[in-house]
UniProtKB/Swiss-Prot annotation:
Family: Belongs to the bacterial ribosomal protein bL9 family.
GO cellular component term, pick one: ribosome
Top-level lineage group: Bacteria
SUPFAM superfamilies: L9 N-domain-like (SSF55658), Ribosomal protein L9 C-domain (SSF55653)
GO biological process, one term: translation
PROSITE patterns reported for this sequence: RIBOSOMAL_L9
Entry-linked InterPro entries: Ribosomal_bL9, Ribosomal_bL9/RNase_H1_N, Ribosomal_bL9_bac/chp, Ribosomal_bL9_C, Ribosomal_bL9_C_sf, Ribosomal_bL9_N, Ribosomal_bL9_N_sf
Keyword entries, A-Z: Ribonucleoprotein, Ribosomal protein, RNA-binding, rRNA-binding
Name listed for the protein in its UniProt record: Large ribosomal subunit protein bL9
Reported function: Binds to the 23S rRNA.
Amino acid sequence: MQIILLEKVANLGVLGDVVKVKDGYARNYLIPQGKAKRATQSNMAQFEALRAELERAHAEKLAEAQAIATKLEGLMVQISRKAGMDGRLFGSVSNIDIVDALETQGFKVERSAVRMPEGPIKQVGDSQVDVALHSDIVVPITVSVLGEQQ
């Protein structure tokens, strides 16, 4: 299926690109998420009319993400959990816990923006976690897990 991208999509293209993707990917993900439209003649004409507005909105989102990124740069988030004598946690620290900790510090971040390549944190100590504020902006933060002894 031929689609017009309405925003940058990883491994696919940028705003305004006409690309061919599998029907299911377009129908079930890109179109419902508002990231693309079918590449028909009427949609192409409509897109060209709205192109400047879409580019302006994209630039605003990017500027907002950069402003948040400068505040998040070098930030350390502390989370305390019950832990055993060996430093292993009873449970784990997930992206939901990190989002909650960021919200208490005044940052509004979506759960899907917190990227944990090694999975949930299960040890006491410091860990690096990436926060993807925009498709172009990824900020590393430090999560310090403090163990509460029983």
